[in-house]
Amino acid sequence: MKAIVIPQYTQRLMVGTFVAASFFATTVQANAAIQQPELDNSAFILIDYDTGTVLAQKNAAQPFPPASLTKMMTSYIIEQRLLSGALKENEPVLMTPEAWCKGSSEESCMYVPVNTTAPVIDMLKGIIIQSGNDASKAMAQHIGGSETTFADLMNEEAKKIGMTHTHFMNATGMPQEGHQASAEDLAKLAQAIICLLYTSDAADER
């Protein structure tokens, strides 16, 4: 029985390590007793990936600012479109002045020069590995026309997945009123991501 833990993390969480850091998988015996994990978090959830059974939780439905865990949904939407053919890996994406990182210490960035382009696949890597806010915003604009419209797409996907305590306002996770998620919802998103990536040969190659 595979299990996934979704704890609550801080603003500076690097999405490039979310599989290892925010969702650490472990194998447990089907009949073994599950002890409540001792985690220094205000919210977490431990689920069986195969069945969705909740093995342990604390404030799992309580919304909180998801910070860079937001980029899980951003990258999920990009990967969906790559698999459907709506996006191509080598498709150029413009780094607009609005998306461009200006070197602020408050942001994690890929640092693509302003008014230049980078391929979709490089932008995706910049989002996942570097937690790039610039890459996230550029891809949001490329797909949705604006980050606001892309956030609407994020919320549509969240509804499909069954994320009932989540609302996205942007593609980066930067603090914004109304931008929230729960550990329970992020577990559902993690399941969707794993299902998408591990049932696709093309995604496996990436």
Question: PLM ranges: what are they?
Answer:
Residues 1-4, 60:
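Extended hydrophobic/aromatic-rich secondary-structure runs
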Residues 15-19, 23:
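Hydrophobic helical h-region of N-terminal Sec-dependent signal peptides
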Residues 8-9, 68, 203:
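Short alpha-helical segments used as structural interaction elements across diverse proteins
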Residues 30-184, 188, 193-195:
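Active-site-adjacent loops and short helices of periplasmic peptidoglycan-processing enzymes
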